């Protein structure tokens, strides 16, 4: 009799459903309006890294005994250790030690298994360069201690702690 009546009812139901979905999305948007921003202004603000952060590797040349444990435990055989055997004292003398941070996966195995603790992880993570060959650090570059983020007065540090809801 009136074939258009069910179509109008179906259209009305779809309109109500669409309005409900829009309202749900709007409520989610309003719930996010009161939250603090998550982003930081990176070069001027930096997050304080955790105590166990695995950044650039620091190397102490005087402590190394050239045992090559770091090379054996590295999943990609990355550290290059050059040494010379001193026959009169029957010991290895370290000549050169280098790590290519363009290849390093920062797993920390070399630091963990080093018997003399001559390797350690720092909180330095800004290693970007325009030339990948500059990422190959020798023992002099690895021995340089980085400036602590907390001690740098030119930037504002932000503590990265989860918020406690009260």
From Swiss-Prot:
UniProt: [4Fe-4S] cluster 2 binding residues? 74, 104, 107, 110
| SUPFAM superfamilies assigned | 4Fe-4S ferredoxins
Textual note on the cofactor: Binds 2 [4Fe-4S] clusters per subunit.
- Record-listed E.C. numbers: 7.1.1.-
**Assembly information from the UniProt record:** NDH is composed of at least 16 different subunits, 5 of which are encoded in the nucleus.
Q: What does this protein do?
A: NDH shuttles electrons from NAD(P)H:plastoquinone, via FMN and iron-sulfur (Fe-S) centers, to quinones in the photosynthetic chain and possibly in a chloroplast respiratory chain. The immediate electron acceptor for the enzyme in this species is believed to be plastoquinone. Couples the redox reaction to proton translocation, and thus conserves the redox energy in a proton gradient.
Protein name according to UniProt = NAD(P)H-quinone oxidoreductase subunit I, chloroplastic
